């Protein structure tokens, strides 16, 4: 049975690419045609890639791999958090901070700081501080929660990065490739398939398209770990 049907992808608008002048020629194998100055993605190729991505992701999850979902643009942010949480993966959905992977020691220290502040807040320790100091600590807590909240369960570098919008997340791509961390990437017609191990050609701007792809990948992770795809909130941390 197909992981995703052509009708599902059509309804999600997964076939709409970018304007033809913005294309990357390396994506030509995944493009069906151009219509009104816009490239149309070949959904038969997308279906094949989705099947491959599902199997690869399921196998990786079954072998205990840890996943990081990355998508910081408005259309993807909420979906990234939802689907990553559903399958117990870590996520970045606000802003990619330089060194999140390549300077992991420093990043881990910031995550530990976030956990410390959360404990202080829940225990009432911050409320007991002088008003000005408490205000400073709460601002720090809010900032860390915004940018690092999705990484609290990540005690080590991820084994796989799942990416929405390769062009926007250039720094994430560069860091993952520098560390030889494989990428499962949604690829619009302006992307480079050579920069990922598991390509999924599709519209990476439409919310429904992002929901469809990330939802299936989350299903694959849950199936690989638990033998079912309906687990919610299972944690892949090392704690």
Curated annotation (Swiss-Prot):
One GO cellular component assignment for this chain's record is:
cytosolic small ribosomal subunit
The terms under GO molecular function for this entry are: structural constituent of ribosome
Name the UniProt key words of this record, in alphabetical order. Ribonucleoprotein, Ribosomal protein
List the PROSITE patterns.
RIBOSOMAL_S2_1 (PS00962)
Q: List the disulfide bonds.
A: none
What gene is this protein a product of?
Answer: rpsB
Q: What is this protein called?
A: Small ribosomal subunit protein uS2
Q: What is the lineage of its organism?
A: Bacteria, Bacillati, Cyanobacteriota, Cyanophyceae, Synechococcales
What domain of life does the UniProt record list for this protein's source?
Answer: Bacteria
Q: Which Gene3D superfamilies match?
A: Glucose-6-phosphate isomerase like protein, domain 1 (3.40.50.10490), Helix hairpin bin (1.10.287.610)
Q: Give the matching SUPFAM superfamilies.
A: Ribosomal protein S2 (SSF52313)
Sorted alphabetically, the Gene Ontology BP terms of this entry are: translation
Q: Which organism is it from?
A: Prochlorococcus marinus (strain MIT 9313)
Respond yes or no to whether keyword Ligase is given for this record.
no
The record's CDD domains line, in alphabetical order, gives: RPS2
The family note in this entry says: Belongs to the universal ribosomal protein uS2 family.
Keyword match Ribosomal protein? yes
What sections of the sequence does the record tag as coiled-coil?
Answer: none
